[in-house]
Amino acid sequence: ESGIRVLEVGCGCGATLAHIAYEWPDAKVSGIEIQDDIAKIGANYLDIRQGNIETMQIPYEKDTFDYIILADVLEHLHDPERILHKLLPYLKADGSILCSVPNILNRHVISDLLRGKLEYQDAGILDRTHLRFFTMDSIVRVFERCGMEVTQMMATYDTEELDAEAEELMNALYQIPHIADRQLFQVYQYV
């Protein structure tokens, strides 16, 4: 789209923003990044501001952005709904929020829990820095409570095989009446 304005929260050095600017040369891209050293690198090339979205004043005018990107950000926030409410005034009336969150209902997490295991990791669904966890239903409800409508949702799927014991546990779990759709356990992330 010609002349779109995009804000990415948690933009890192700005790779996604740079790609948008390359694909749509008329686009105006901006970013907010919490890590000072990373924000400084990106700020050499793009409009990237350093700050913590949970505590900072947003340095842009209201009704500015066509899109606000929150890629793997909400799960790191203390109060995701408060931040969505904080960002909404900066979105144009016909604008959209593009968001991705990991799925806590993933079969690897559930099979480990059924075996009494809960181990945080350096990356992934149980990343040590995650403060919030979401299922498909819960992330939709977060947006609805903020007065927004989820108009499109996609999923990325976990293709890693389960060990035999975990597979047996999950197959038994699928037999329980009223359990979530089997496919939801294979989702790694919602977008």
Language model segments and positions:
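A short, aliphatic-rich alpha-helical micro-motif
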Residues: 42-43, 62, 84
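S-adenosyl-L-methionine-dependent methyltransferase catalytic module, highlighting the catalytic core
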Residues: 15, 19, 67, 78-191
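A short beta-strand submotif of the Rossmann-like class I SAM-dependent methyltransferase core
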Residues: 67-73
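A short acidic, Gly/Pro-enriched loop at the edge of an enzyme's catalytic core
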Residues: 58-67
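Residues at the starts of beta-strands that form the adenosine-phosphate
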Residues: 5, 28, 149
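Class I SAM-dependent methyltransferase SAM/SAH-binding core
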Residues: 15, 19-56
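Conserved class I S-adenosyl-L-methionine
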Residues: 3-12
